Design a protein with these regions (language model features):
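Paired acidic/hydrophobic, glycine-rich loop segments that form the ligand-binding mouth/hinge
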Residues: 68-73, 88
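Glycine-centered hinge/linker elements that transmit conformational signals in sensory
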Residues: 15-51
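Extracytoplasmic/periplasmic substrate-recognition and gating elements
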Residues: 33, 41-46, 50, 81-145, ...
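Conserved C-terminal helix/tail region of periplasmic/extracytoplasmic solute-binding proteins
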Residues: 171-212
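Extracytoplasmic/periplasmic solute-binding protein
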Residues: 1-24, 67
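Short, flexible turn/loop "capping" segments at secondary-structure junctions
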Residues: 14-16, 102-106, 186
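Extracytoplasmic/secreted proteins, especially bacterial periplasmic and envelope-associated proteins
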Residues: 1, 31-41, 57, 75, ...
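Short helix-initiation/N-cap motifs at beta->coil->alpha
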Residues: 49-64
Length: 212
């Protein structure tokens, strides 16, 4: 989200045909430096991220009412409701000096038909039925799933959670769906984690390492 705010529309650039090019990373260079500096500032300048806090600690503190806000997704809402947390959904503000709004990576769940199925036609028809607006509304009401169908969102527009996420989603970018994404996750995480752990960490070196 922070990398997108500072200019990286995705992890990878696109080629002339509009396909993701795994040889061209967008999260390094000046974009990476600014994003990492902001993350570092959250910890050491603004003191908004306490020392030693990871997702588990932050999530637990939010459920206990000891944390004012958390960056999270629809998957966490069930636990928050069980903990009786009075919460709302809102886009993260644009970081200082950012050229774009903050935006998360987006992913969707789908229905997959087995290529070896003996009843492909019936399976496809069933899959199409599952993703109709009416059934997506039913999935939301039964399990809190956030629909991507505009017609379903329209039907649920009075639901504050659905309404909140519907304002966040347009700001996001699709999660890269190429195999090379998995190879970036580890080094990216290893390179960015120290920004909130060490006040002397060189944020200019990390983006260079990502591009190496």
């Amino acid at each position: 989200g922070f990398f997108k705010a500072f200019g990286a529309e995705n992890v990878f650039a696109k080629d002339a045909k509009g396909n993701l090019d795994p040889t061209k990373l967008l999260i390094g260079g000046e974009v990476g430096e600014k994003a990492l500096q902001f993350i570092k500032d959250l910890r050491f300048k603004y003191n908004l991220v306490p020392e030693g806090v990871d997702y588990g600690v932050a999530d637990g503190a939010f459920k206990d009412g000891a944390l004012a806000m958390i960056l999270n997704g629809p998957w966490a809402l069930g636990d928050y409701k069980k903990a009786k947390v009075d919460f709302g959904i809102a886009p993260f503000p644009a970081p200082p000096g950012a050229k774009n709004p903050w935006g998360p990576f987006l992913g969707v769940q789908g229905v997959v038909v087995n290529a070896y199925s003996k009843n492909k036609t019936q399976a496809v028809n069933f899959a199409k039925t599952l993703v109709t607006g009416r059934n997506l509304v039913a999935f939301n009401q039964a399990g809190g799933r956030i629909p991507v169908s505009k017609s379903a969102v329209k039907q649920l527009e009075k639901d504050p959670v659905v309404a909140g996420f519907s304002k966040v989603f347009p700001l996001g970018a699709p999660m890269p769906n190429i195999p090379e994404t998995a190879k970036v996750r580890g080094p990216w995480g290893n390179a960015t984690s120290p920004t909130s752990q060490r006040p002397d960490y060189n944020v200019k070196k990390t983006p260079t390492d990502l591009l190496a």
